[in-house]
């Protein structure tokens, strides 16, 4: 038994997997499965198709990877200890951080949804800067990946925010991987390729998708396309969630809203994406415009956060607390 335990401990990379030929390992790497973590969370069917290997081989590889990483049933106490190790990124506003119990969490997908001008993209910019701060200042000393689907990323805004925090502007820019997604297939392919990037660069601690639904809405309009759209969107969101969980990364997605004509009381706006987006993100925050530069953030869904709302401000320097 001790020999078996020692063998598991000796498996550090996919090259150490027992009984797997170099040819198969090369196929796995080419298919984007370059780490034990990505193999452990893969499905046998997906791995078999992507790498061009028999289903039985895929099942064996996944089992070996899971055994090496000690993926098993855990006690509630173990889960509690893992939750205590979750890291957080400050938003720049103490009030908003308080609403989020300390900031944006790693290992979790957080959704910000709201109308145009409600502060979604501003928050994405600010978090891409703040993640680079040292932990004692609310960051993770990490890098960000920014997937822009609407062309709203502005380097000038990053520059202003970095300058306000006294950071070296060129260093901040250099620590943000930016890519413009031109359609849904490109957006999905980018996230597929992210597995390789984050496994090679463990300093990546934030992934932003702004916005996650824009291309899906444009390319799959009408009820006749709804099932296909939701299926693709669901798989896309789960890929992002896996990245968050496997690599201890914070994932931020933004989403638009639409009006519901059948609602005669309360807030008539709802987030785009239907039930798929109601259930996948771990934390859902609605943003609303208020007076001037003030914005309202409200917890819509989060298993560990109480319902509530706070006011914050969009300033020239970035996200800040609203002045009384």
Curated annotation (Swiss-Prot):
SMART domains: AAA (SM00382). The keyword Repressor does not apply. Transmembrane segments: none annotated. The keyword Nucleotide-binding applies. Keywords: ATP-binding, DNA damage, DNA recombination, DNA-binding, Nucleotide-binding. GO terms for molecular function: ATP binding; ATP hydrolysis activity; ATP-dependent DNA damage sensor activity; damaged DNA binding. InterPro entries: AAA+_ATPase, DNA_recomb/repair_Rad51_C, DNA_recomb/repair_RadA, DNA_recomb/repair_RecA-like, DNA_repair_Rad51/TF_NusA_a-hlx, P-loop_NTPase, RecA_ATP-bd, RecA_monomer-monomer_interface. Pfam families: HHH_5, Rad51. GO terms for biological process: DNA recombination; DNA repair. ATP binds at residues 114-121. HAMAP family: RadA_arch (MF_00348). Belongs to the eukaryotic RecA-like protein family. Involved in DNA repair and in homologous recombination. Binds and assemble on single-stranded DNA to form a nucleoprotein filament. Hydrolyzes ATP in a ssDNA-dependent manner and promotes DNA strand exchange between homologous DNA molecules. This is DNA repair and recombination protein RadA. It comes from Saccharolobus islandicus (strain L.S.2.15 / Lassen #1) (Sulfolobus islandicus).
């Amino acid at each position: 038994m001790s020999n078996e335990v020692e063998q598991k401990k000796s498996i550090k990379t996919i090259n150490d997997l027992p009984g797997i030929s170099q040819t198969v390992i090369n196929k796995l790497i080419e298919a984007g499965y370059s780490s034990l973590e990505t193999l452990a969370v893969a499905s046998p069917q997906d791995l078999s198709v992507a790498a061009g290997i028999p289903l039985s081989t895929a099942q064996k590889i996944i089992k070996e990877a899971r055994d090496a990483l000690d993926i098993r049933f855990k006690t509630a106490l173990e889960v509690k200890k893992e939750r205590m190790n979750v890291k957080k990124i400050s938003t720049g506003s103490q009030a908003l951080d308080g609403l989020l119990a300390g900031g944006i969490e790693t290992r979790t997908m957080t959704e910000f949804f709201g109308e145009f001008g409600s502060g979604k993209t501003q928050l994405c910019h600010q978090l891409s800067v703040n993640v680079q701060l040292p932990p004692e200042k609310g960051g993770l000393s990490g890098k960000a990946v920014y997937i822009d689907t609407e062309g709203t990323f502005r380097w000038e805004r990053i520059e202003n925010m970095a300058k306000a925090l006294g950071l070296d502007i060129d260093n901040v820019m250099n620590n943000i991987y930016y890519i413009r997604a031109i359609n849904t297939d490109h957006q999905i392919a980018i996230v597929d390729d992210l597995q390789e990037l984050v496994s090679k660069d463990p300093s990546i601690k934030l992934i932003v998708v702004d916005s996650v639904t824009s291309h899906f809405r444009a390319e799959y309009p009408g009820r006749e396309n709804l099932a296909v759209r939701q299926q693709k969107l669901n798989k896309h969101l789960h890929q992002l969630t896996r990245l968050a969980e496997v690599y201890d990364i914070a994932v931020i997605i933004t989403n638009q809203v639409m009006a519901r004509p059948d609602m005669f009381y309360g807030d008539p706006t709802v987030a785009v994406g239907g039930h798929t987006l109601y259930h996948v993100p771990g934390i859902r925050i609605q943003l609303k415009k208020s007076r001037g530069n003030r914005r309202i953030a409200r917890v819509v869904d989060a298993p560990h956060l109480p319902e509530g709302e706070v006011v914050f401000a969009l300033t020239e320097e970035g996200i800040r607390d609203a002045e009384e």
